[in-house]
């Protein structure tokens, strides 16, 4: 329609907010604007943050809340100010409302907190309060969920194929899941490779920053893998959209002493390549492939059905029954 541009703009606004808070968080970690900028630029090498961003959907909508949750949680751990913990509770609730898979990040943060409970014993009260804030915000949704027979949960389960039990799925789907993640991250690793002088990985297990970033980046993916193994669920690629937001920060922190800033020209060339390739590819596919959902003639079909109805009936169409796509377009 004529207002489709608004959805594309909204998507980019969400992405910009996300990148801004990734940069803000990275600045707290590195206290160096160059490394903070690199943390964001590296994301251009990940499929989810370039090619798929024009389409505004639940995967894009949860991006800023994912970044904000990590940022405010870290600020809460750093200062223990109730203000940051309240904000964490608010944005994490909105993130969960964007998509239930947001729970994987919240579980990762909880696991990190529990594993370091002795160090953060003074933070328990404020962290618990942030959880209470989230639950209060989520109460109306939980009531709606109960009254509507958990329809959104069953929708997700059906999309993952959990209801179709097959033992081989417990092996096949996790392998497919891991394989796809490796392929998706290849451009990211290329960008990292060109600026690293030596591949010496030294992880200080006592470094709070590294432990936190390992938790934020790896635990959600590990939990997703475990879910696929235990349930045989087919993890759809787009479900992983927010999971890699802080991967650049993690790798830069691990290899910080071996980053060669003299190679930045090569890095910028690769960055520009992926930065330009993404919109050009998206534009090309949009012009060539007319079977995408964005090209679905919903208004024309709706108008045709309405005209047929008016020719045969005098009353209005009050209810349209069908799946969310066809019935949604028709209504």
Task: Annotate each predicted stretch with a short phrase.
Residues 39, 84-100, 110-111, 133-136:
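Membrane-interface alpha helices of multi-pass inner-membrane proteins
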Residues 103, 295, 299-331:
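Short periplasmic/luminal acceptor-recognition loop of GT-C membrane glycosyltransferases, typified by
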Residues 211, 229-266:
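Hydrophobic/aromatic-rich transmembrane helices and adjacent perimembrane loops
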Residues 257-287:
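Signature aromatic-anchored transmembrane alpha helix within multi-pass, membrane-resident enzymes
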Residues 9-30, 68-72:
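Transmembrane-helix motifs of polytopic, lipid-linked glycan transferases
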Residues 94, 105-210, 220, 225-226, ...:
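Transmembrane-lumen/periplasm boundary regions of multi-pass, lipid-linked membrane glycan transferases
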Residues 28-30, 69-84, 255:
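Membrane-interface transmembrane helices that cradle and orient dolichyl/undecaprenyl
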Residues 51-61:
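Short acidic/glycine- and proline-prone juxtamembrane loop motifs at membrane-interface regions
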